[in-house]
A protein has these predicted regions:
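Substrate-binding pocket helix/loop in short-chain dehydrogenase/reductase
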Residues: 1-3, 7-12, 98, 109
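C-terminal substrate-recognition "lid" of short-chain dehydrogenase/reductases
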Residues: 117-146, 150-151
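Short, small/polar-rich loop/turn modules that mediate ligand/substrate recognition or access, typified
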Residues: 79, 84, 139-141
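Active-site loop immediately N-terminal to the catalytic Tyr-X3-Lys motif
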Residues: 4, 52-58, 80-81, 116, ...
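Residue(s) in the substrate-gating loop at a strand-loop-helix junction
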Residues: 47
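Active-site helix of classical SDR
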Residues: 26, 63, 71
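Active-site loop-to-helix junction immediately N-terminal to the catalytic Tyr of the SDR YXXXK motif
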Residues: 1, 6, 53-61, 73, ...
């Protein structure tokens, strides 16, 4: 949709799913983790849209930018309390979400990815395992792009 045509009910739905539910998950997780002697790790999912505006998807772009900033805000509030929160930001992924893209558009996007391919859901495993492990204990409030180098080009 163009911004002037974006339906209000669609906006509300995307906000609920992509932002409100993330916030409530963080809140509930903190309520449990703050009672644990070991604290915990929270991993949010942003998008490359957390870094820049995307055409025809204003609600999606707004929510992913908000998730990135929410992650940073909570990281500041939880620093020193034994809880780390970081955000993984996938680039173009071969998932259902992009299934309706034309092949021409997919090819156009692929040309901008230095890795020369779209990500696969399996490409998210490494960052998730790292962020959930003790190896990331000093990492807090970070946005981790998983995008085949898209953002550096």
């Amino acid at each position: 949709y163009l911004p002037e045509e974006f339906p209000a009910e669609q906006w509300d739905l995307v906000m609920k799913i992509n932002l409100d539910h993330v916030w409530f998950m963080i809140q509930r997780s903190l309520q449990v983790m703050l009672k644990q002697p070991t604290g915990g790790k929270i991993i949010t999912i942003g998008s490359m849209a957390s870094y820049f505006g995307c055409t025809t998807v204003p609600a999606y772009t707004a929510t992913k930018g908000a998730v990135a900033q929410l992650t940073k805000s909570v990281a500041v509030d939880c620093a020193g309390r034994g809880i780390n929160i970081n955000c993984i930001c996938p680039g173009y992924m071969d998932t259902e979400m992009c299934a309706n893209m034309t092949q021409e558009r997919k090819d156009e996007c692929t040309k901008r990815i230095p890795a020369g391919r779209w990500g696969l859901p399996e490409d998210m495993k490494g960052p998730v395992v790292f962020l959930a492990s003790a190896a990331s204990d000093y990492l807090n409030g970070a946005l981790i792009p998983v995008d085949g180098g898209y953002l550096v080009k």
